[in-house]
Amino acid sequence: LYNKEYEKAADCFKNVITSNKYALYDDYAELFKPGGDESSEMIFAIQNIGGVGKDHGMPMCFYMGSRETYGSCWNNVMVATTFVDTYENKDGTPFNWEDWFPGFTTSDDVKDQTFRAELKNNKVKTYPVAKDKLLEMYEKRDPRMSASIILPYTQYTGWHANSIEYCEYVIARGINSGKGY
C-alpha cells in the first residue's frame, strides 16, 4: 500500500484472507509478549524475549530512546509523524489535525501552541494549553497508536541511574534529553 501498488496489495491480502491461517487476536498488547509471535494475527514476527540488558530498556531502546528510556545514548531516532498520522480515529474515519486544532497543518505557531511546554530547572513550568485536548485526541484514535508509540504528554516506564523511572514525554525548547526530556 505504501508504494501505491494497490492491485498487487489487494491480491496479496486476498491470499491472506482465503488461506484461513490468520485472524485478528483478541488482545493487542498480548501480541508483544512471549507466545504472541505464534498468535493467529502474526504474519511476520520478531519477538523480543528479554534477557538482554535491562527489562525496561532493551537494546533497541538504548539506540533509539531517550536517556530515560535506557539511561544513556541519544534520542534522535523517532517515528515519522506522517506515519503516526496514518492511525485512524476509533470510528474508522481518517485522522485530520484540522478537526482538533484549526490551522495546525499550515501554521508553525499553532503547532508550537499545541505542543510546546516551558521548563524551569528541568521541571515543567507550564504545559501547553492544548495538553488535555491532545490527550483526549489520543483516546479517540485507534488504540494501537498509543500501545505502539510514546506520544507527547503521555507517561512511560524508563530506566535511569540503574533503576526504573516513570517518565513523561515533554516537548520543549533549549533542553537536552537528561532527566526525561
Describe the predicted segments one by one.
Residues 2-174:
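An aromatic- and glycine-enriched ligand-binding surface/loop that stacks and positions planar moieties
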Residues 175-181:
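Long, K/E/R/D-enriched contiguous segments that form extended
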